[in-house]
């Protein structure tokens, strides 16, 4: 599939790169917007509501390894290299798929 078919194969490559960068770059922004910040959970945020719900459901504490605990950890410390690589691959695959030519 080259220019003769009306499709620029570079478009899929650009979409793949953009997808990978966006996938990794938006994680911390999204978590911060939810209230999982580098200094802890922000008051009156979605994160605070999630933590309250998890604590009530668990008898007063948030269980280690729960979704809230994991998101709090990522919000405070950032993503590990492995998580960035996995997220980058997922974003790259999605970007390549979205940038590919439509099926005939």
UniProtKB/Swiss-Prot annotation:
<protein>
    <recommendedName>
        <fullName>Interferon alpha-inducible protein 27-like protein 1</fullName>
    </recommendedName>
</protein>
<dbReference type="GO" id="GO:0097193">
    <property type="term" value="P:intrinsic apoptotic signaling pathway"/>
</dbReference>
<dbReference type="GO" id="GO:0006915">
    <property type="term" value="P:apoptotic process"/>
</dbReference>
<feature type="transmembrane region" description="Helical">
    <location>
        <begin position="59"/>
        <end position="79"/>
    </location>
</feature>
<dbReference type="GO" id="GO:0031966">
    <property type="term" value="C:mitochondrial membrane"/>
</dbReference>
<feature type="transmembrane region" description="Helical">
    <location>
        <begin position="14"/>
        <end position="34"/>
    </location>
</feature>
<dbReference type="InterPro" id="IPR038213">
    <property type="entry name" value="IFI6/IFI27-like_sf"/>
</dbReference>
<comment type="function">
    <text>Plays a role in the apoptotic process and has a pro-apoptotic activity.</text>
</comment>
<dbReference type="Pfam" id="PF06140">
    <property type="entry name" value="Ifi-6-16"/>
</dbReference>
<keyword id="KW-0812">Transmembrane</keyword>
<dbReference type="InterPro" id="IPR009311">
    <property type="entry name" value="IFI6/IFI27-like"/>
</dbReference>
<keyword id="KW-0053">Apoptosis</keyword>
<dbReference type="GO" id="GO:0060090">
    <property type="term" value="F:molecular adaptor activity"/>
</dbReference>
<keyword id="KW-0472">Membrane</keyword>
<keyword id="KW-1133">Transmembrane helix</keyword>
<comment type="similarity">
    <text>Belongs to the IFI6/IFI27 family.</text>
</comment>
<feature type="transmembrane region" description="Helical">
    <location>
        <begin position="81"/>
        <end position="101"/>
    </location>
</feature>
């Amino acid at each position: 599939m080259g220019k003769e078919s009306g499709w620029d194969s570079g478009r899929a490559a650009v979409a793949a790169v953009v997808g990978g960068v966006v996938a990794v770059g938006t994680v911390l922004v999204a978590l911060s917007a939810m209230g999982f910040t580098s200094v802890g959970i922000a008051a009156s945020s979605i994160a605070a509501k999630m933590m309250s719900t998890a604590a009530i459901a668990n008898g007063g504490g948030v269980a280690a390894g729960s979704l809230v605990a994991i998101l709090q950890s990522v919000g405070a410390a950032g993503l590990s290299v492995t998580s960035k690589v996995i997220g980058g691959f997922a974003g790259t695959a999605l970007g390549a798929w979205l940038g590919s030519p439509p099926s005939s």
